[in-house]
Amino acid sequence: LSVNYQWLVR
């Protein structure tokens, strides 16, 4: 997983 997961979980 990458940093993109931060907004995904939002």
From Swiss-Prot:
This is Uncharacterized protein IMPP12. It comes from Nautilus macromphalus. Nacreous layer of shell.
